[in-house]
Amino acid sequence: MAPNLRKSHPLLKMINNSLIDLPTPSNISAWWNFGSLLGICLMTQILTGLLLAMHYTADTTLAFSSVAHTCRNVQYGWLIRNLHANGASFFFICIYLHIGRGFYYGSYLYKETWNTGIILLLTLMATAFVGYVLPWGQMSFWGATVITNLFSAIPYIGQTLVEWAWGGFSVDNPTLTRFFALHFLLPFAIAGLTLIHLTFLHESGSNNPLGIVSNCDKIPFHPYFTLKDILGFALMVLPLTSLALFSPNLLGDPENFTPANPLVTPPHIKPEWYFLFAYAILRSIPNKLGGVLALAASVLVLFLSPFLHKAKQRTMTFRPLSQLLFWILVTNLFILTWVGSQPVEHPFIIIGQLASITYFTILLILFPIIGTLENKMLNF
């Protein structure tokens, strides 16, 4: 009998073991679809980004008009730009849901997979930030100024670090040029990290909604989950194209339709919606260094999840108290996102401070306590 090329060819063998004959738990739900959706997001962003880069000029005098030119004069340039800008939003929606899934079902106990995932999140955040600066509108310029300025809070080396990042004494042409270089490079770094993420995942195999070992009941990835993933793609592409075609500027800031002007500060400087929760935590501390540390901690706290897991059960499927706490955390993140978009005045300041305290309290204190309590309840 002739050997099966899919199983014998050195390259096809890798693809086969990762995407075709991969043993997969039979009971994973739609929450396990977001990994493949993130892959599609990444490919879409790289493709549209490449097409945009062909028409973009990384120069302060030309950047804004080159983007306008792309939208006006390039064949379907408006569509490519709208898909790229809104694709970023969908990327973040998918990654937040993916992390939420991992948190709910205890997937963080696969430490290597979880840690590479957090590094992926940080890289994605960096990519989105430098990308937002490229159109060189008002919010691009002032967002870059405010966020890069945060590094000056680092003791002793802060100011030097900021001027080194800027390539001068303010955000100017060198800053834009290097941000374009970084925005081009980082998505490929994300693609490389994704392969590492998947390598670690395939070492252990997928988790499942019950959180129990599922070796006795696994099915091949293809055709079952390839088909399921295609349904997922369709359900994501539909709202993405609808948003890009019907209301492409819904999630953007009107301030960015004005070319960057260092002499005029916008009344409310705020990042894109997907950074608002972290921005609210940053603003809730009246001290610069304290705010920067809280901002960093808001994401880096995820690294501690595996060590704060005290429950005997892996997932929250049969842990109602932890479930309640989880959904309070989700609501709290929505409150932080909303507060981050509001001006710094009463009552938003105190709401932001309370929500920030709640965020860290739930993650660092309440989850371990409730987990231990539920262990005790198992004995009754």
UniProtKB/Swiss-Prot annotation:
Indicate yes or no for the key word Transmembrane helix: yes
The answer to keyword Cell division applying to this record is no
Q: How does it sit in the membrane?
A: Multi-pass membrane protein
Instruction: Give the residue spans that cross the bilayer.
Output: 34-54, 78-99, 114-134, 179-199, 227-247, 289-309, 321-341, 348-368
User: Can you tell me which residues bind heme b b566?
Assistant: 98, 197
Something else the entry says is: Heme 1 (or BL or b562) is low-potential and absorbs at about 562 nm, and heme 2 (or BH or b566) is high-potential and absorbs at about 566 nm.
Q: How does it assemble?
A: The cytochrome bc1 complex contains 11 subunits: 3 respiratory subunits (MT-CYB, CYC1 and UQCRFS1), 2 core proteins (UQCRC1 and UQCRC2) and 6 low-molecular weight proteins (UQCRH/QCR6, UQCRB/QCR7, UQCRQ/QCR8, UQCR10/QCR9, UQCR11/QCR10 and a cleavage product of UQCRFS1). This cytochrome bc1 complex then forms a dimer.
Q: How is this protein named in the record?
A: Cytochrome b
Species whose genome carries this gene: Macronectes giganteus (Southern giant petrel)
